[in-house]
Amino acid sequence: MAVTMRQMLEAGVHFGHQTRFWNPKMAPFIFGHRNKIHIINLEKTLPMFNDAQKYVRQLAANRGTILFVGTKRQSRDTIAQEAQRAGMPYVNARWLGGMMTNFKTLKVSIKRLKDMEAAVEAGELEKMSKKEALLFEREIAKLQKSIGGVKDMGGIPDAIFVVDVGYHKIAVTEANKLGVPVIAVVDTNHSPEGVDYVIPGNDDSSKAVALYAEGVADAILEGRANAVNEVVQAVRGDDEYVEENA
């Protein structure tokens, strides 16, 4: 379902940062200021968000992987929830340097996590001493927190969706280095450079974060559904062709 201007207003997408912290590169997306707070021009944000959703829809229809990134306190739960709903990987605890540029190392950690989870399933914990079990549980909890959201990501993602480019500068830099497209929410205090699909908007409000994440997840699910429908239609068409020529 398409996001409306009213929904953006209600979520506070238009509230930027204090004027003294602004980044001049965001000037084209700023409407003005009120009480020393920059106001983002939603007439720019809405079509740009629609463009980002269109791109995500196409990517998902082609079975692409979009990595959700949002590690700030107010976005963690939403990022995990919406990524899981869309069947996509996510990082919501801390971006570990090299998560994309040094994927080989990440794969080693993912294997370790999966092996440990398999050991738990097999009841291996019961065979351990109390101390061994405690250390094991601590390690698995740490791994689940840091890489649990990417354990099923088979390789470098086809795109990343980031909430707050300043806070996740390393993630954006790694994506740029590898030529991975970046879809990102950029507030008035950051630069839109290095972002392929800029969504000018508030990156602190939990309501605004929910609006972006839900919109991206919805676009992924729509893209996948469209792809399935096309396959069904093609199969139906083939069946009709066979019947006609039978």
Swiss-Prot record:
Enumerate the CDD domains for this protein.
RPS2
Q: Does the keyword Ribosomal protein apply?
A: yes
Q: Which keywords fit this entry according to its UniProt record?
A: Ribonucleoprotein, Ribosomal protein
Supply one GO molecular-function term.
Answer: structural constituent of ribosome
rRNA processing is among the record's keywords: no
Q: Which Pfam families match?
A: Ribosomal_S2
Would you kindly state one Gene Ontology biological process term found in this protein's UniProt entry?
translation
One GO cellular component term of this record is: cytosolic small ribosomal subunit
Q: What InterPro entries does the entry give?
A: Ribosomal_uS2 (IPR001865), Ribosomal_uS2_bac/mit/plastid (IPR005706), Ribosomal_uS2_CS (IPR018130), Ribosomal_uS2_flav_dom_sf (IPR023591)
> Which family does the record claim for this protein?
Belongs to the universal ribosomal protein uS2 family.
Q: Which NCBIfam families match?
A: rpsB_bact
Q: What is this protein called?
A: Small ribosomal subunit protein uS2
In which organism is this protein found? Burkholderia thailandensis (strain ATCC 700388 / DSM 13276 / CCUG 48851 / CIP 106301 / E264)
